[in-house]
Amino acid sequence: SDVYKRQLFISVKPVTTEVMLAAVCDKSLSVLNDANWYWTSATYGPRLNLIRTFVNTYLMEDGTPFTDKEGYKTMVFMDEVKNRDKRLQQTIRMGDYKRIDGGVQTPAPPIFSYTYTGYQPIKYCLDDVFYDSGANNDNSIPLIRFAEVLLNYAEAKAELGVFTDADWEKTIGALRGRAGITGGLTARPTKADPYLQANYFPEITDPSLLEIRRERGIELVFEGLRFSDL
């Protein structure tokens, strides 16, 4: 689980155990990016957010669907994010998120001058507010990484009808395990999730393929692949 941290997306040097190709920044060459500006400005970028329909697809820590919980539709923010897949915490501002201003860490809830939905992204944002105004970021941006290879492998085998429990364990199970999920890591699911079918993939009946699609959405969120996946 140590590999999948925010460090994967905010490190100056690519995390070589995961990243295969990256856009590498270098202050000495004046090669920087504008991730903080893009993801925090009320005027510069398109103010991209997650929506609740998608946030609902993040599993509970025990591997069960959040949408199986009674009352999930009306939960307040602080309740709905409890005990979820840790990638949610690494993707949006939650109650424990802090930023650095003048060397001091301060709580940083979602800012509604930016976010329309309350689910404000942090995936590529450096914590210091210094980086917010202009192209100041020096973090490298992963372009191809091992997780995508695992997901492509899993999906190809599932589409061919030859996806096994062993395949599940070394692909989807491995990705979920490093994100802090404890259940359902060694065997394929046997029941199709009706929430995924109703909201995203009505044409899919295979439980394994449905879960692979869930995993692609969560693992690769904001990495530029969602439109093609859908």
Locations of regions flagged by a protein language model:
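Short, cationic low-complexity segments
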Residues: W39-D62, F112-Y116
